[in-house]
A protein has these predicted regions:
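Hydrophobic alpha-helical connector segments
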Residues: 86, 97-129, 178-185, 205-209
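Basic, helix-initiating cap at the start of DNA-binding domains
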Residues: 1-52, 56-65, 82
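Amphipathic alpha-helical segments enriched in hydrophobic/aromatic and basic residues
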Residues: 49, 58-59, 69-70, 80, ...
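Amphipathic alpha-helical segments used for helix-helix packing
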Residues: 123-143, 194, 198
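An amphipathic alpha-helix adjacent to DNA-recognition modules
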Residues: 35-43, 55-56, 67, 76-100, ...
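Amphipathic C-terminal alpha-helical segment
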Residues: 123, 161, 165, 185-202, ...
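Amphipathic alpha-helical packing segments from all-alpha helical-bundle domains
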Residues: 93-96, 126, 143-169, 179-187, ...
C-alpha cells in the first residue's frame, strides 16, 4: 500500500532528530504532524528492536507502542523493513551537513570529519543492545540491506568530496584516492560500533574518538596530524 507520506522529504525526519522542527514556508501543520508520527513510529520500533531483535518485532507491536492504528503504519512505511530506512535518512542527513560545512570553508576538514564520525555514532550509540540489533537486522533482512546500501552509496560519495576538499586545502595527503579514504572512514566507524556493541564500556564516543585519531594520522599531510 502506498501513500504520499511514504515519499515525504527526508529532511523532516532529519530536522526532528536534530531538534530543528522546520517552520519554513511550504511546511504546514499537516506535514509537521506527519513527520512527528513517522518519527514516533521509528523511535518505538527502535526500542522494541533493541529488546527483541528485528525479526521478532511485528508491525502490530510497533503501532501499539506508538499508540496509532495499524493502518497508520502503512501510511508512512511500505513494510517493516522501511522503518529502518529512517535511520539511513538520519545518517545521510548528517553527511549532507558535513559536506555543507566543508563547502563553507570556515572549519578545518579535520574538524568536519571529526564531528561527522561522532554524529554518525549517536543513533547506534544509544545502547549496545540497539547497536547489536541494528547490525543483526542488516544481516538478516535483504530489504533492510538494500535500503541501507542505497543510502550508504550516496553517503560514500559525499564523504569522498569532503576528503577532496581536505586535499585541496593541504590537510589530507593528495596521493590518496578520495574514494578509498571515504571507504576507510566508514569501515572504521562501523567496525568500531560493532566492537563496542560487544563490550558496552566505555561509552561509544570514547571508542569513536580513539578510532578517528588513528584514522586521521593515517591520512593527514605530515605535520598536520
Amino acid at each position: 500500500m502506498k501513500n504520499s507520506h511514504i515519499s515525504s522529504p527526508t529532511t523532516l525526519a532529519e530536522d526532528f532528530v536534530a531538534g530543528k522542527m522546520p517552520r519554513q514556508a511550504g511546511v504546514g501543520r499537516r506535514e509537521r504532524r506527519g513527520a512527528e508520527t513517522r518519527l514516533k513510529l521509528f523511535r518505538c520500533a527502535l526500542q522494541l528492536i533493541a529488546k527483541r531483535g528485528f525479526t521478532n518485532v511485528t508491525v502490530e507491536e510497533i503501532t501499539e507502542a506508538a499508540d496509532v492504528g495499524k493502518g497508520t503504519f502503512f501510511n508512512y512505511f511500505e513494510t517493516k523493513d522501511h522503518v529502518l530506512g529512517v535511520m539511513a535518512e538520519i545518517q545521510l542527513g548528517k553527511v549532507r551537513e558535513a559536506i555543507s560545512l566543508a563547502g563553507q570553508g570556515q572549519q578545518a576538514i579535520h574538524s568536519v570529519l571529526h564531528r561527522l564520525v561522532l554524529c554518525l555514532a549517536e543513533e547506534p550509540g544509544r545502547s549496545p543492545d540497539l547497536a547489536r540489533a541494528l547490525i543483526s537486522s542488516f544481516l538478516a533482512s535483504e530489504g533492510v540491506r538494500n535500503i541501507i546500501e542505497r543510502n550508504m552509496q550516496q553517503g560514500h560519495k559525499m564523504i569522498a568530496e569532503v576528503v577532496a576538499a581536505g586535499q585541496k586545502r593541504g590537510e589530507i595527503d593528495p596521493r590518496l584516492q578520495k574514494e578509498k579514504v571515504a571507504t576507510q572512514l566508514l569501515q572504521a566507524e562501523m567496525g568500531t560500533i560493532l566492537l563496542w556493541s560487544t563490550h558496552g564500556e566505555p561509552a561509544l564516543e570514547a571508542w569513536i574518538e580513539d578510532s578517528f585519531q588513528h584514522f586521521w594520522r593515517a591520512i593527514a599531510v605530515s605535520g598536520k596530524e
